[in-house]
Amino acid sequence: MKLQLIAVGTKMPDWVTRGFEEYQRRFPRDMALELIEIPAGKRGKNADIARILQKEGDLMLAAVAKGNHIVSLDLPGKNWTTPELAEQLSKWQLDGRDVSLLIGGPEGLSPACKEAASQSWCLSALTLPHPLVRVLVAESLYRAWSINNNHPYHRE
């Protein structure tokens, strides 16, 4: 199974890249974590945010492999505990499809991305910077995997 993290933004700070790659490399080959970066639209004083969101959303959805299960990361989504995320990960594996997780930019996800998602995950009720979300999602997914595989990484 492949977990695709499709995220708006390129040229992240080094600590974001290192943090994401740290968890990415821990996954076994049969549970690969892949990052696809979508260029962020240019935001300025008079930027048309709705148009930018639409373009970013179109690019994100174009990056989703056909047949993938789509999960949006969005505030109205389900707030899973770590054991609940582990259960979700097991369900996704049993489903047999790869999973695409969509992380929006500063203004979030386009309406098209939200509509295309069959699930929505609220990582936190806090407002988080989107670069940090990459690292948190990678760590959370690795922790969920470790629970499902009786790996000592997660401790109760």
Curated annotation (Swiss-Prot):
Its main location: cytoplasm. Keywords: Cytoplasm, Methyltransferase, rRNA processing, S-adenosyl-L-methionine, Transferase. Pfam families: SPOUT_MTase. The keyword Calcium does not apply. It catalyses: pseudouridine(1915) in 23S rRNA + S-adenosyl-L-methionine = N(3)-methylpseudouridine(1915) in 23S rRNA + S-adenosyl-L-homocysteine + H(+). GO terms for cellular component: cytoplasm. Its EC number is 2.1.1.177. CDD domains: RlmH-like. S-adenosyl-L-methionine binds at residues 73, 104, 123-128. One of its GO terms (molecular function) is rRNA (pseudouridine-N3-)-methyltransferase activity. It is an enzyme of class 2 (transferase). NCBIfam families: PRK00103.1-1 (NF000984), PRK00103.1-4 (NF000986), tRNA_RlmH_YbeA (TIGR00246). Homodimer. Belongs to the RNA methyltransferase RlmH family. Specifically methylates the pseudouridine at position 1915 (m3Psi1915) in 23S rRNA. This is Ribosomal RNA large subunit methyltransferase H.
